[in-house]
Structure formats: C-alpha cells, structure tokens
Amino acid sequence: NKGPDAVQALKQGKVDCVIIDEQPAKAFVEKNSDLKILDDAFADEEYAICISKDRSDLTEAFNGAIEELKADGTLDDIVNNYIGDDTKGKTPYESPADADHSKGTLKMATNAAFEPYEYYDGDKITGIDADMARAICDKLGYDLEIDDMEFDSIITAVSSGKADFGAAG
C-alpha cells in the first residue's frame, strides 16, 4: 500500500516490478541506484484536490485561487522547484510577508510518502502539494495545517469534516 514498502519488496525480490507515479519513482531511483524506470508509461493520470460536496463555497474559493496562481505563474514556480533538472530548488514558495491569515486554519489531509508531491523534510511536510496548498491558503486568508495519514483515509477525513480538503500526489 505504500511506495517505500513496494520498493523494499522489489529490492528483496518479493515482487517483479512496482507501478507508481513517475515523480515518486524518480525519487526512489535517485536513492536506489540499483533500480531503474522503464521507458514505457503504464498510464497517464490527472490529479485533483478533494473537498466535501457539502463545501461548495470552499470549492469555488479554491478554484478561484488556483486560477489566480496559474495566471501569476506561482503554480509553475512551485512545480518547477521540485521537478526539472534546470529549475529544481530554485523557486521555493514562501508565504508573502503580508499574507493575511485572519480567517483561521484549513486542514489538509495527505499521505506524505510521495516525493516530490508530499514528503517529510525533517519533521516538516513539504512538496508540490504542500506548497500549492500553502499558496492557496495564503490567497484565501487562511493558515494551513497538514495532517499525514494513510492514503485510503483521506476521502473519509474530508467527507467527515476531520479535514477541509485532501491532496496526495
């Protein structure tokens, strides 16, 4: 169920291959020189943020913030900071000094095991999804709290109200 467990099983010969998203696969191969990525893609996927159907106001606010972040180049900068040989590490997202977080805190449910989307750097969850969520919250006037959980628990956490939204690579 977890990328690191699958990679360990592969290295131990318990499985013949691991099918995982491209960017986490690259992170695993970078740390395990005895592994390789095949040239043929298994499938193309799209990613999304999940928000409870009962929170249409939050969905609309997120969609608006995402459009603004696309238009001003912030989302591209976030992605480029984690993916790309020429840009990796060069455009880290920093909350604006004057960011207003007076509306409270939004909680993001994630599974921090899919570098570069979300992963631990020391004791802090970072990555594309974490930075994107932080940028959205900055636009909307909220602080961000990130809750790491099992991947299969994210939708339940969001639909039950334990988390305001979910994002997990």
Where in this protein do the model-derived segments appear?
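Extracytoplasmic small-molecule ligand-binding "clamshell" domains
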Residues: 101-169
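Soluble non-cytosolic domains of exported or imported proteins
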Residues: 1-4, 12, 19, 52-60, ...
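A ligand-binding cleft/hinge motif common to bilobed small-molecule-binding domains
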Residues: 7-43, 152-156, 167-169
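Hydrophobic residues within well-ordered alpha-helices
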Residues: 10-11, 49, 62, 136, ...
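Periplasmic-binding protein-like
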Residues: 22, 26-63, 66-95, 99, ...
